């Protein structure tokens, strides 16, 4: 198990937490109230900063319940928090619904998943190896 250092920068901040054993994502909590109008976008503050282990990233992902029940999702999903970033963790939410949505203090607004990062060496080549798929993409396998 890895350790993540977390610093509260606001006295309203709640530490991220796993809701259940075996969950991949930790819930992230808002420290503010904010209304997001239909089609609107808002940066939601969490009041925390993190220090990730070497060769990891934090991915900020939507919560399925907010998406299904309120049409609220993370705009740039997954949002990437790089290992060296030391600023406040913010969550960019978008309202795809038809009604305004109110973010409450201490509301669970997103999930944070910690993932390993592989560094690769770039090799420029003239040809790539052949595969069965080749250049098939964008629905090339059909829907049934």
Swiss-Prot record:
Keyword flag Cell wall biogenesis/degradation: no
A Pfam match: dUTPase
Pathway, per record: Pyrimidine metabolism; dUMP biosynthesis; dUMP from dCTP (dUTP route): step 2/2
Family, similarity comment: Belongs to the dUTPase family.
Species this chain originates from: Alkaliphilus metalliredigens (strain QYMF)
GO molecular function (one): magnesium ion binding
HAMAP family found in the cross-reference section: dUTPase_bact (MF_00116)
Function field: This enzyme is involved in nucleotide metabolism: it produces dUMP, the immediate precursor of thymidine nucleotides and it decreases the intracellular concentration of dUTP so that uracil cannot be incorporated into DNA.
InterPro entries named among the record's database cross-references: dUTPase, dUTPase-like, dUTPase-like_sf, dUTPase_trimeric
Cofactor(s) annotated in UniProt: Mg(2+)
Catalytic reaction list: dUTP + H2O = dUMP + diphosphate + H(+)
Protein name as catalogued: Deoxyuridine 5'-triphosphate nucleotidohydrolase
GO biological process: dUMP biosynthetic process; dUTP catabolic process
Swiss-Prot/TrEMBL keywords: Hydrolase, Magnesium, Metal-binding, Nucleotide metabolism
EC numbers, comma separated: 3.6.1.23
């Amino acid at each position: 198990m890895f350790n993540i250092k977390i610093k509260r920068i606001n006295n309203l901040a709640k530490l991220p937490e796993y809701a259940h054993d075996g969950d991949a994502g930790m819930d992230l909590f808002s420290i503010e109230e904010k209304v997001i109008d239909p089609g609107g976008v808002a940066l939601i503050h969490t009041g925390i900063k993190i220090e990730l282990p070497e060769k990891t990233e934090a991915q900020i992902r939507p919560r399925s319940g907010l998406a299904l029940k309120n049409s609220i999702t993370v705009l740039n999903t997954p949002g990437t928090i790089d290992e060296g970033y030391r600023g406040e963790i913010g969550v960019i939410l978008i309202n795809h619904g038809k009604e305004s949505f109110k973010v409450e203090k201490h509301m669970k607004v997103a999930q944070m998943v910690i993932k390993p990062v592989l560094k690769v060496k770039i090799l420029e080549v003239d040809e790539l190896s052949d595969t069965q798929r080749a250049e098939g993409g964008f629905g090339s396998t059909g829907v049934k």
